[in-house]
Amino acid sequence: MDTIAARALTVMRACATLQEARIVLEANVMEILGIAINRYNGLTLRGVTMRPTSLAQRNEMFFMCLDMMLSAAGINVGPISPDYTQHMATIGVLATPEIPFTTEAANEIARVTGETSTWGPARQPYGFFLETEETYQPGRWFMRAAQAVTAVVCGPDMIQVSLNAGARGDVQQIFQGRNDPMMIYLVWRRIENFAMAQGNSQQTLAGVTVSVGGVDMRAGRIIAWDGQAALQIHNPTQQNAMVQIQVVFYISMDKTLNQYPALTAEIFNVYSFRDHTWHGLRTAILNRTTLPNMLPPIFPPNDRDSILTLLLLSTLADVYTVLRPEFAIHGVNPMSGPLTRATARAAYV
């Protein structure tokens, strides 16, 4: 299936180079399009030309690219347009070994397949405590009953620790059961002035220490902590104290947008508004997948099918921009006039 996807990507990118009718095509583009169009016309009985000039010819070439995108992604889009019918035989065209594919396309598909079939350490973009259901007021003393050291969450990436005079305790527990981190990078600081429960202000005296695995860590410096070693805080002073611990970032096996080069840009290209026809076409295609149909996904996609669909659909969007096809989509009423931000914004409502 990787070679099928690589051929589809190669052919669509070759079509995206046809930005004017009299352009001098590169030799490899002529070879790719010559073989691909010949095989496609033979199996589908369509009349795609290598140099489309009329609207009908541009439509035919775009429909060929649409067929290839759907076949490579394994999507059966169904009846979405009175002007277009998906040719299921296109998969046979893409399976033809005579159609060459570029090194770039092959490498990109190999990256998609390789990265989605395994896991690796990645810097996560969200706060470590993002999914915490409750939070506490920052800078306000809080001590649970029968405790001398109490740690609470006070933000999506922050905890604060209240300590009685002379108290020592391990706050590792508050990090457990969250996000399955491989390494946590944190910074600790003394809260110079904090409010007691009664509302009066109190100072954290110098001398409070934070240690990882028994080694004291300097305040205001990034500490690499594996989440397993003891994270102890000691208040040797004779009055209450408070400490703030910020998770700068953490590394885990969760997939991110860095798993594939320019995945963020590909997603933006897919979900961008070009006109109402593209908006309806993209929505109809993504309705047959697990991806959202109008707005980008909340979390990075982590399976091969989703990322491959985004890559192929982004390339199809480029072809749409170049060929400027005009056809109808069921349920879509094209609007005339120039494209404005207000027009694009209204399409997502």
UniProtKB/Swiss-Prot annotation:
- The main place the protein resides is virion
Which GO BP terms apply?
Answer: fusion of virus membrane with host plasma membrane
- Which Pfam families did the record assign? Orbi_VP7
Protein name, please?
Answer: Core protein VP7
Q: What is this organism's lineage?
A: Viruses, Riboviria, Orthornavirae, Duplornaviricota, Resentoviricetes
The record's family statement is: Belongs to the orbivirus VP7 family.
> Is 4Fe-4S tagged as a keyword?
no
Glycosylated residues? 287
SUPFAM superfamilies per UniProt:
A virus capsid protein alpha-helical domain, Viral protein domain
